Amino acid sequence: MFDPTLLILLALAALGFISHNTTVAISILVLIIVRVTPLNTFFPWIEKQGLTIGIIILTIGVMAPIASGTLPASTLLHSFVNWKSLIAIAVGVFVSWLGGRGVTLMSSQPSLVAGLLVGTVLGVALFRGVPVGPLIAAGLVSLFIGKS
């Protein structure tokens, strides 16, 4: 039986591997496994909670250097007096705000997710980009199309 969704997922996974975006490729392969096994009953839960769980894991990864002591408190405090660090803080606030808009947009208009994913994979493959941007990209899209 022909399954166009499975074909699209396989093509996106292949693009992920071709562009050395293993995070995207592995994620898609996991979803393919879920789709073709009895685990597919978990899709409603994955759709509802997946983004939240991903953000929690990402936040743990970002905060780990502070929690482990690799990033000393003195360095953290110094970031409030150095002008480059203040710019980094401002950009971090802006990007976090964009990411929040992106989550809202992706939740309200899931049809954009495929375009964001393809754009991210193409950016990695063609322009030596880094695959960090679907939420931020969605936030930028929300600015262009006027959605909050």
From Swiss-Prot:
One Pfam family recorded for the sequence: DUF441
Disulfide bonds: none
Transmembrane stretches, start-end: 14-34, 51-71, 86-106, 121-141
Keyword Iron-sulfur part of the UniProt annotation: no
Places the protein is found: Cell membrane
Membrane-protein topology: Multi-pass membrane protein
Keywords associated with the record: Cell membrane, Membrane, Transmembrane, Transmembrane helix
GO cellular component: plasma membrane
Keyword check for Transmembrane: yes
InterPro entries linked: UPF0756_TM
Family as reported in the entry's similarity comment: Belongs to the UPF0756 family.
PANTHER family: UPF0756 MEMBRANE PROTEIN YEAL
UniProt-recorded name of the protein: UPF0756 membrane protein Ent638_1667
Biological source species: Enterobacter sp. (strain 638)
